[in-house]
């Protein structure tokens, strides 16, 4: 049985019009629209046959049999076309909806990409700013370390990587707090202490501030108080400052303290209490070992297996003597000199001479007051108008090369190093180019005669040293830590 489409593909042969069949009726149109087909179907009430030529044979058939079949076929095709048109319209609507959704998604993606780009640029700018800030801080810290002759070393990268591998992920945050930062004690090893150099450095530091007075606040004002030496005991295995506790050499804080002293500086741990330095009263006990367990020596005789007796330990730690004031401590409590009506009156000298006969005294340092323009002006001011406030002055105490003499100079802050050198040369009756003026805290050699005392940091008072000129240096004022 053939399909309706197959029947449509067949060419229908229309018979020729014959005037003899029905001359008064128009010829039948086989193909037309649905209205024509319906009109054609309505007019087929009677079984009317179309006469065909004899050449078609038996193909000719009554119109009443062929008409309904073509009408159903056309109606079916019409319905299918309508369904296809509806499907096509629905698909077109769906495509338009999807296109609109795609456009919306593209706009959203573009907006997100732009936001991400802006966030990335902002983060990049923040990181660059932070990097510049950290680089500036690192530069400042490196310059600070170089001022003291130090250099940052750090840790090897392989060591840091090995430490990071051994730490678990759960303890990573704790490790960041405990191990990420450098600890000064981790870089120090127990040193071999040079006791002779340590004693010499302590003596130099004590001589530098010997007899200095410190401003102490009192009710209603302030007064000068002579610094008392700090008791310092040096044992074979550590030191003891003040009244304890004992500090072994392997302790990081002790190593830092010894390093400061050996480098010619006062310990940094004493800077808050004594910003200008403090003398030390050193007890050399290098031949004794301090018991680190805090227990004293066994008082009786010890016994071991195989021996009857064990000799008593002889290197006992000496007991702390009572706090008895010596004559030198008593003199240090007194002011060195006072100014009355323009005259500098020595206070310690007569009392020292009185005490010299009754108790042994160390060798006295001869103090020489150098006549300066500032001293003469201050003497005149105190006589003419004693009620006027005292102007800003610089009190210099300069020790000679052998330490037996100390020159006291009252200078203006505007005076220069050259003025000090000329006054010292006149007082000593020698050439000004034969000696150098230096300070040990910080180590500085003053060679530029044009530098003022204010610029050199020698106001309001300072303690300096003299030494024989060794060689001419290229820099006028050496940086701290460069003292030859």
Curated annotation (Swiss-Prot):
The lineage of its organism: Eukaryota, Metazoa, Chordata, Craniata, Vertebrata. This is UBX domain-containing protein 11. It holds the Pfam family SEP. GO terms for cellular component: cytoplasm; cytoskeleton. Interacts with GNA12, GNA13, RND1, RND2 and RND3. The keyword Ligase does not apply. May be involved in the reorganization of actin cytoskeleton mediated by RND1, RND2 and RND3. Promotes RHOA activation mediated by GNA12 and GNA13. Residues 69-147 form a coiled coil. Residues 1-28 are annotated as: Disordered. The modification Phosphoserine is found at residues 478, 482. It is found in: Cytoplasm, Cytoskeleton. It comes from the Eukaryota. Its main location: cytoplasm. PANTHER family: UBX DOMAIN CONTAINING PROTEIN, UBX DOMAIN-CONTAINING PROTEIN 11. Residues 389-466 form the UBX domain. Keywords: Coiled coil, Cytoplasm, Cytoskeleton, Phosphoprotein.
């Amino acid at each position: 049985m053939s399909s309706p489409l197959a029947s449509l593909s067949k060419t229908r042969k229309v018979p020729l019009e014959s005037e003899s069949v029905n001359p008064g009726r128009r010829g039948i149109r086989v193909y037309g629209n649905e209205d024509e087909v319906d009109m054609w179907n309505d007019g087929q009430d009677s079984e009317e046959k179309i006469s065909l030529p004899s050449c078609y044979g038996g193909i000719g058939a009554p119109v009443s049999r062929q008409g309904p079949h073509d009408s159903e076929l056309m109606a079916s095709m019409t319905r299918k076309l309508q369904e296809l048109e509806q499907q096509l319209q629905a698909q077109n609507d769906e495509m338009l909806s999807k296109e609109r959704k795609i456009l919306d998604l593209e706009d959203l993606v573009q907006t997100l990409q732009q936001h991400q780009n802006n966030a990335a640029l902002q983060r990049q700018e923040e990181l660059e700013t932070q990097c510049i800030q950290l680089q500036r801080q690192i530069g400042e810290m490196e310059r600070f370390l170089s001022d003291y002759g130090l250099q940052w070393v750090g840790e090897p990268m392989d060591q840091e990587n090995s430490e990071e591998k051994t730490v678990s992920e759960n303890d990573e945050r704790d490790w960041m707090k405990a191990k990420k930062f450098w600890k000064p004690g981790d870089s120090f090893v127990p040193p071999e202490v040079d006791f002779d150099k340590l004693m010499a450095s302590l003596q130099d530091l004590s001589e530098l501030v010997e007899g200095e007075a410190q401003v102490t606040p009192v009710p209603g004002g302030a007064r000068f108080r002579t610094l008392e030496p700090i008791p310092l005991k040096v044992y074979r295995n550590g030191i003891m400052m003040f009244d304890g506790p004992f500090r072994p050499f392997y302790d990081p804080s002790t190593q830092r303290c010894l390093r400061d002293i050996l480098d010619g500086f006062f310990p940094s741990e004493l800077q808050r209490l004594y910003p200008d330095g403090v003398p030390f009263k050193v007890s050399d006990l290098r031949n004794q070992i301090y018991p680190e367990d805090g227990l004293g020596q066994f008082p009786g005789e010890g016994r071991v297996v195989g021996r009857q007796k064990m000799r008593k330990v002889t290197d006992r730690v000496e007991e702390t003597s009572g706090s008895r004031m010596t004559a030198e401590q008593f003199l240090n409590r007194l002011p060195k000199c006072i100014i009355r009506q323009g005259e500098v009156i020595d206070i310690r000298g007569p009392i020292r001479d009185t005490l010299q006969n009754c108790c042994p005294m160390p060798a006295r340092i001869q103090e020489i007051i150098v006549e300066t323009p500032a001293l003469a002006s201050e003497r005149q001011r105190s006589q003419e108008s004693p009620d006027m406030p005292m102007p800003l002055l610089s009190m210099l105490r300069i020790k000679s090369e052998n330490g037996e003499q100390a020159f006291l100079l009252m200078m203006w802050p505007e005076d220069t190093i050259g003025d000090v050198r000329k006054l010292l040369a006149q007082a000593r009756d020698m050439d000004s180019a034969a000696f150098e003026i230096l300070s040990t805290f910080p180590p500085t050699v003053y060679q530029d005669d044009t530098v003022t005392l204010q610029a050199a940091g020698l106001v309001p008072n300072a303690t300096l040293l003299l030494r024989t000129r060794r060689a001419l240096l290229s820099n006028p004022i050496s940086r701290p830590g460069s003292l030859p």
